[in-house]
Amino acid sequence: MERAIQGNDAREQANSERWDGGSGGTTSPFKLPDESPSWTEWRLHNDETNSNQDNPLGFKESWGFGKVVFKRYLRYDRTEASLHRVLGSWTGDSVNYAASRFFGFDQIGCTYSIRFRGVSITVSGGSRTLQHLCEMAIRSKQELLQLAPIEVESNVSRGCPEGTQTFEKEGE
C-alpha cells in the first residue's frame, strides 16, 4: 500500500519511518518497496538516549511534489551490490511520471531528500526544472552513500598523492 502524505501531516511525519509502502504504485516515484525495520529490530540498533542517531541498517529518502510526499526507508550495507540496488530505487522517468500526476497549470515545488548516518541532503526546485533536479538528486545520493565516513580514505592519507605511482625494484 502506497502512502502519500499531504499538508501538515507531511511535516509531522517527516522523521517517521514506520509505515508500509508498496513498490511501483501508480503514482509513486519509487521502484522498490519500503524496507523499514520492525520496532524490535529498530530498538536493537539504536540508542534511546540519542534521538538523532540514524538506524545503521539503511537510509531514508523522499520525493515531494507540492504538498504530497512519498517516503522510503531502504536497507543498505555499503557493499557494491547493495549500492547498485538502492541507486535504482527510482529513475528520472519514474519521478517524472509520478510528478506529472500532481502538476496543474502552475509550477509546483519539487523536493528530494535523503538522510544517511546523520547527514541529510535536500535538493529542491520548481516543476519546470524537474529533469535537472533529478540529475542533482542522483549525484547527491551516489556521493552520500559512497562517501560513508568509515570508508573515506584518500590517496594522500595513505601517503601516496594523487597521480603518483609506486614502482617496486625487482630483486636479483
UniProtKB/Swiss-Prot annotation:
Keywords: Host-virus interaction, Inhibition of host innate immune response by virus, RNA-binding, Suppressor of RNA silencing, Viral immunoevasion. GO terms for molecular function: RNA binding. The keyword Cell membrane does not apply. It holds the Pfam family Tombus_P19. Residues 1-37 are annotated as: Disordered. InterPro entries: Tombusvirus_p19 (IPR004905), VP19_sf (IPR036131). It comes from the Viruses. GO terms for cellular component: virion component. One of its GO terms (biological process) is symbiont-mediated suppression of host innate immune response. The keyword Isomerase does not apply. Viral suppressor of RNA silencing which binds specifically to silencing RNAs (siRNAs). Acts as a molecular caliper to specifically select siRNAs based on the length of the duplex region of the RNA. Belongs to the tombusvirus protein p19 family. Homodimer. This is RNA silencing suppressor p19. It comes from Tomato bushy stunt virus (strain Ja9) (TBSV).
